[in-house]
C-alpha cells in the first residue's frame, strides 16, 4: 500500500532512525493542521532532504508523523483507534489515548513555567511525533509488557535497541524510536520528551529491569534531572552524559 509520494534524490534511509530527514518549511495554511495536511503540503512543495541519507542524524518530528500515516494506510484505520485497540486496551492502559483534531473540545492545556496556559496551536493535532497522553502507572504497564514480551517479540524489540545512527563513533546512538547510551556492561535505553509545557523522562535499565518515569505538564527543565537517579543503578556512572 502507498501513501501520496514525491521523489527526492539519494539512497534509502530510515525515517524512524532519523537517517533520512526531510526539511519541512513553515506551513502557512490557517487553522489547525492534521497529518494529511502535512503530507499534502510536502507533496505540493517537495521539500528537500536536510542531508544525504545515512550520512548523518538529526531529530525529526516530521518523520514520526509520516510513520503514523503509513500505519493508517497499512491497517485501514486511524492511528488513535489503532493504538487504542492494539496497545492501550490489551495492556490495560485505561488512562492513555492519542489526542487528535476531533478532541479539541476536551483539550486540556499544559503550562508555561510562569503558570500561563498554552493555547492550542497549529501543529497540536498532528500525531505520531507526540500527542499520546498517559499516566506514570499506564506507562509502567507498557514498560513491563516490553520486558515480558507479551505483545512484542523479543527479537523485534532487539531490533529497536540496535544502533541506527552510526554517522560517527559514539557511546550515544539512536535505534528504532529509542535513544541509547552504550556502556561496557549494558545499554541504557531511554527517550525524554517535550512539547509546549509537557516534559517527560523515560529511562530503562534493561539489565536491572528497572525504569525511571517522570511526567510533568508545567514546563520545568528540572524534570530532566531525574536522570541523576541512574547513578543508583550504575556504580560511578556520570548521569550528565545522558542527553535531555
Specify the residue positions occupied by each region the protein language model found.
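Glycine-centered structural positions embedded in regular secondary structure
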Residues: 177, 193, 211, 226-230
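Short acidic, gly/pro-rich beta-turn/loop elements at beta-sheet edges
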Residues: 170, 188, 212-214, 222-224
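Short, well-ordered beta-strand elements
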Residues: 201-218
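Short, gly/Ser/Thr-rich active-site loops of penicillin-recognizing serine hydrolases
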Residues: 184-185, 219-244
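Short, surface-exposed loop or secondary-structure junction motifs
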Residues: 1-196
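Short, glycine-/Ser/Thr-/acidic-enriched flexible segments
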Residues: 195-196, 217-220
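Short, low-complexity, polar/charged sequence segments that are solvent-exposed and flexible
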Residues: 153, 197, 208-209, 231-236
